[in-house]
């Protein structure tokens, strides 16, 4: 009889835990919950996902960079890097050690038209 009680106690100590579920199932459930929580903030971060509009403290007030969208900034940076890597534009070194790089490029027409409208509107508002 005493042997039966000890074997029953062992069974109880190795028995499933937490509402009758085995430990490995609970671990899997916990893993799934953690995984879903990692994915949920993506929807919650939609507000944060929109990048903050950058400011250009060193740029003049009438600098076009103040009016560029994220896409236009990206296009400009890509164009500048491509031009530099392919040898377009003019790169020079002054006697004081300053490096200068100057290049001209075109954005797609839709972006150019939008920028012309935005800059002409802000220029006319500044004149008033």
Swiss-Prot record:
Source organism, top-level taxon: Viruses
Disulfide bonds: none
A Pfam family annotated for this UniProt entry: Arteri_nucleo
The keyword Ribonucleoprotein appears for this protein: yes
Region of interest called Disordered, as start-end residue ranges on this chain: 1-60
Keyword list, A-Z: Ribonucleoprotein, RNA-binding, Viral nucleoprotein, Virion
Subcellular localization(s) per the UniProt record: Virion
Gene Ontology MF terms in the entry: RNA binding
GO cellular component: ribonucleoprotein complex; viral nucleocapsid
Family designation: Belongs to the arteriviridae nucleocapsid family.
Record protein name field: Nucleoprotein
Gene that produces this protein: N
């Amino acid at each position: 009889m005493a042997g039966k009680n000890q074997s029953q106690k062992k069974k109880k100590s190795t028995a499933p835990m937490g509402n009758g579920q085995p430990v490995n199932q609970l671990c899997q459930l916990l893993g799934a919950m953690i995984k879903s929580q990692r994915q949920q903030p993506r929807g919650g971060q939609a507000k944060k996902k929109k990048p903050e509009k950058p400011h250009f403290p060193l740029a003049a007030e009438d600098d076009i960079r103040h009016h560029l969208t994220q896409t236009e900034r990206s296009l400009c940076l890509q164009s500048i890097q491509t031009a530099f890597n392919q040898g377009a534009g003019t790169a020079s070194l002054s006697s004081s050690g300053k490096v200068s790089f100057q290049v001209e490029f075109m954005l797609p027409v839709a972006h150019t038209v939008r920028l012309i409208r935005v800059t002409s509107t802000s220029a006319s508002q500044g004149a008033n």
